[in-house]
Amino acid sequence: MINFDNSATSFPKPASVARAVSEAVSHFGGNPGRGGHKISGEAAQKVFEVRSRAAEMFGAQVENVAFTLNCTYALNMAIKGIMQFGGHVIISDYEHNAVSRPVYALWKMRGVRFSVARVSDDDDETVGNFRALIEKDTRAIVCTVASNVTGRILPYKKLGELCKQHNICFIGDGAQACGVVGLTLADGFDFLCTAGHKALYGPTGTGLLISNGAFALSTIIEGGTGATSAELEQTGTMPERLESGTLGTVGIIGLGEGLKFVRRKTPEAIFGHEMRLCEQFAQMIAQDKRVKIYEPQVRRVPVVAFNIGDMHSEKAAQMLSQKGFALRGGLQCAALAHRTLGTLQQGVVRFSPSVFSEKAQVNALARAIYTMKE
């Protein structure tokens, strides 16, 4: 099976990540920060090394890097931590459910109001659409850096500037961009949320919540942190405040090797390789008159969203799976984006290569699409 569903989870992983995970299971089994003994200290040191590596990559202070289970958890922590006590929040019409569902839940349970800004092909118009929705009690703008459906890159730097002008918290969903776009907090993010298991090439069960320290978060999870254990109130010390319970040390150590891998390759080189494959794929399948490609001209991360005639995208993905290719059909957990694209009923088939994908594999996939019958 050839994996072209790397936007969901990159696979295969670098060999160094697999080795690091194996070594962690065998040699770093202590509970980090939970005891003064050697095995706890060794695990804590490994976790700190990965935290420091992430801080360096994303331009953060090391104490402002919190580990999470995935990007969805990071987004929930940031959105609910900022909006827990009410107010108004703005999101885009390209959001993943990891943004839209927490916002909807806040509206339903806490009366938080939200607005949805329309994304335009003109970046200045997009920013203007966000600006027009700002109210007196707008506390945050939350948006994806890049759509997980079409790969479209939103004007995140300009939105960061807009937030700074109005003293609004800017929360970025970097799940599809971190690792292929050189994002840092200097791009204007107050919180940058991302997955470890996608383009950072770490194991599943890893994510990052990265902050510039400008906005304090209310907690949505409390518990043991290894700090101020005599107090009933959750510690205010970062990152422990956001890391209740035992950390996933094995996954974190694997993520550390993924970060090393990306830094060594560079996001720019990875982006270039994957985008060349996307362009090759798009050019080949465009020769099939049945194929429709969505947003082919927009600035995007390496993703191609397409459909084959009137065939439902999930059926197409299933047929391709039978031919040995893994692609994602359906709504990609992003109903807002599909409503915007007009694909809510059919969905799309998503092609997303990785640094390990090859031209010959893309050619074989295109040939398989040519032979598919509706």
Identify what each model region corresponds to.
Residues 1-374:
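Pyridoxal 5′-phosphate
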